[in-house]
Amino acid sequence: MRRSLSMPTSPTPVSSECTQQQGSLPAPTPRGRLVVLTGPSGVGKGTLVNQLRQRHPELYLSVSVTTRPPRPSEQEGVNYYFRSREEFLNLIEANELLEWAQYAGNFYGTPREIVFQKLNQGQDVLLEIELAGARQVRQQYPDAIRIFLCPPSLEELERRIRERGQDSEASIERRLEQARKELDAQDEFDYVIVNDNLEQALQELEALLYPPSPSSKEQQP
């Protein structure tokens, strides 16, 4: 059953592609919470996560392993762990990945050991991953909190992808086709947030993961 966030601000208009759901989560437990954030390429997952971690640096963002070549601004162990295809396949064979998927000709995966180490230490862990990986996590860790980040419309998503200026026309078409499939899968997630406005989406995500305590509410004027 999907839920979404109850916000004191006026709700964001929801496109025909997404159905925003509302609700809230229990507070952190002695064992950390595993949070899975998924959404189409270009929807703004990375920007939203960076903003959230600026406010909550205690939230551990899992660093993925990939066979994709590093971009000029990317650092080993910060943005990704960059590995050869052979090394990645060895990680799969050794069952060292919590999830893995192939996207645009490259492999991506989540190291298993560090995720469960952080969870056992009581730290919340965030996975920013694709749909195929989110489905694998659901099978292996059914208690994971699954959040789908949705664009206000496919037209707006296309505009954002084109604005980045990183993709060929063929690549843009592939990304949009994949986005349509991912939007069809939003019912698989516990919560849906529409990223029409970054600040509002951030407030909604923050309210979901870090709801104010009853005592703090009582202290408000």
Swiss-Prot record:
<keyword id="KW-0547">Nucleotide-binding</keyword>
<comment type="similarity">
    <text>Belongs to the guanylate kinase family.</text>
</comment>
<dbReference type="InterPro" id="IPR020590">
    <property type="entry name" value="Guanylate_kinase_CS"/>
</dbReference>
<dbReference type="InterPro" id="IPR008145">
    <property type="entry name" value="GK/Ca_channel_bsu"/>
</dbReference>
<dbReference type="InterPro" id="IPR027417">
    <property type="entry name" value="P-loop_NTPase"/>
</dbReference>
<feature type="region of interest" description="Disordered">
    <location>
        <begin position="1"/>
        <end position="32"/>
    </location>
</feature>
<protein>
    <recommendedName>
        <fullName>Guanylate kinase</fullName>
        <ecNumber>2.7.4.8</ecNumber>
    </recommendedName>
</protein>
<feature type="compositionally biased region" description="Polar residues">
    <location>
        <begin position="1"/>
        <end position="24"/>
    </location>
</feature>
<dbReference type="InterPro" id="IPR017665">
    <property type="entry name" value="Guanylate_kinase"/>
</dbReference>
<dbReference type="GO" id="GO:0004385">
    <property type="term" value="F:guanylate kinase activity"/>
</dbReference>
<feature type="binding site">
    <location>
        <begin position="39"/>
        <end position="46"/>
    </location>
    <ligand>
        <name>ATP</name>
    </ligand>
</feature>
<keyword id="KW-0418">Kinase</keyword>
<comment type="function">
    <text>(Microbial infection) Catalyzes the phosphorylation of dZMP to dZDP, when the bacterium is infected by a phage that produces the substrate for the synthesis of dZTP (2- amino-2'-deoxyadenosine 5'-triphosphate), which is then used by the phage as a DNA polymerase substrate.</text>
</comment>
<feature type="domain" description="Guanylate kinase-like">
    <location>
        <begin position="32"/>
        <end position="210"/>
    </location>
</feature>
<dbReference type="InterPro" id="IPR008144">
    <property type="entry name" value="Guanylate_kin-like_dom"/>
</dbReference>
<dbReference type="GO" id="GO:0005829">
    <property type="term" value="C:cytosol"/>
</dbReference>
<comment type="function">
    <text>Essential for recycling GMP and indirectly, cGMP.</text>
</comment>
<keyword id="KW-0067">ATP-binding</keyword>
<keyword id="KW-0808">Transferase</keyword>
<dbReference type="Pfam" id="PF00625">
    <property type="entry name" value="Guanylate_kin"/>
</dbReference>
<keyword id="KW-0963">Cytoplasm</keyword>
<dbReference type="GO" id="GO:0005524">
    <property type="term" value="F:ATP binding"/>
</dbReference>
<comment type="pathway">
    <text>Purine metabolism.</text>
</comment>
